[in-house]
Amino acid sequence: MESMSELAPRCLLFPLLLLLPLLLLPAPKLGPSPAGAEETDWVRLPSKCEVCKYVAVELKSAFEETGKTKEVIDTGYGILDGKGSGVKYTKSDLRLIEVTETICKRLLDYSLHKERTGSNRFAKGMSETFETLHNLVHKGVKVVMDIPYELWNETSAEVADLKKQCDVLVEEFEEVIEDWYRNHQEEDLTEFLCANHVLKGKDTSCLAERWSGKKGDIASLGGKKSKKKRSGVKGSSSGSSKQRKELGGLGEDANAEEEEGVQKASPLPHSPPDEL
């Protein structure tokens, strides 16, 4: 009979042979679960192109707003003559600092418009979807959604990430923005900052995307209404002026007739000379 010491290696080898097929199976892929993939598809974070596009848009707007003042900043007093030297605020470092420090907070005014495509999904104002839902609620319709009503106006994950990426971009390309401010303001900021630096050699297609509106859009309807009002006012003014002319003409005719009547009645007939 075989001793126990000889049987021990065989006993250990048998379980290893059973586990061998499991060890040869391919390792599971690391990544999100199917549910996680659906959530990722639903929440599509902004691309670098989208971030740079709206950073440039807000920089242009902020520089335009702060460029209307004629304020002069006193930079201190001279050592010898005691006279202070000044610099225009529009060309000062203070203006550049104030704009760049607050620029990313302006992106929190944006909303996510899921009904739009491309980079146009980011825009200021309430999206058409939520505007419709708000109108239904105000009319007394019960709207059931996964998101509580109190959170409808909260900042979306996409917009929050837009602001977060903006902070990183402005810090990383601070010198480029400063160079444009001091030396290249005649060049388009979107082209200078995004196409030539931030997105150099990368996809820049979103920079050319423009939202032209569509049928039923509030903005376009408002523009048409205002034009109609203006044309109506113009028509009424032209009509009133025409009426005034007609009335004026009638008045002139009446006055002319009155004057003719006065002139006709004024000459007295000459009485024949009295005969002596």
From Swiss-Prot:
Main location, first listed in the record: endoplasmic reticulum
The family database entries (InterPro entries) matched by this protein are listed as: DUF3456
What S-S linkages are listed for this chain? C49-C206, C52-C194, C104-C166
Q: Which residues form the signal peptide?
A: 1-26
Give the Pfam families listed for this entry. Answer: DUF3456 (PF11938)
Keywords of this entry = Chaperone, Coiled coil, Disulfide bond, Endoplasmic reticulum, Glycoprotein, Immunity, Innate immunity, Signal
Q: Where in the cell is it found?
A: Endoplasmic reticulum
Q: Which stretches are annotated as coiled coil?
A: 153-179
Q: Name one GO molecular function term.
A: signaling receptor binding
Q: Name one GO biological process term.
A: innate immune response
Upon gene disruption, the observed phenotype is:
The birth rate of knockout mice on a C57BL/6 background is very low (approximately 10% of pups). The animals appear normal, but their growth after birth is severely retarded. Half of them die by the end of the weaning period. Mutant mice have profoundly impaired T-helper type 1 lymphocyte (Th1)-mediated responses. On a BALB/c background, under resting conditions, they show spastic or dystonic features and, during the open field test, they exhibit hyperactivity and anxiety. Their resting electroencephalography show enhanced activity in the fast beta frequency band (20-35 Hz).
Gene Ontology cellular component annotations, sorted alphabetically: endoplasmic reticulum
Function recorded in the entry: Toll-like receptor (TLR)-specific co-chaperone for HSP90B1. Required for proper TLR folding, except that of TLR3, and hence controls TLR exit from the endoplasmic reticulum. Consequently, required for both innate and adaptive immune responses.
Assembly and partners are described as: Interacts with HSP90B1; this interaction is disrupted in the presence of ATP. Interacts with TLR1, TLR2, TLR4 and TLR9. Strongest interaction with TLR4.
* Family according to the record: Belongs to the canopy family.
Protein name (record): Protein canopy homolog 3
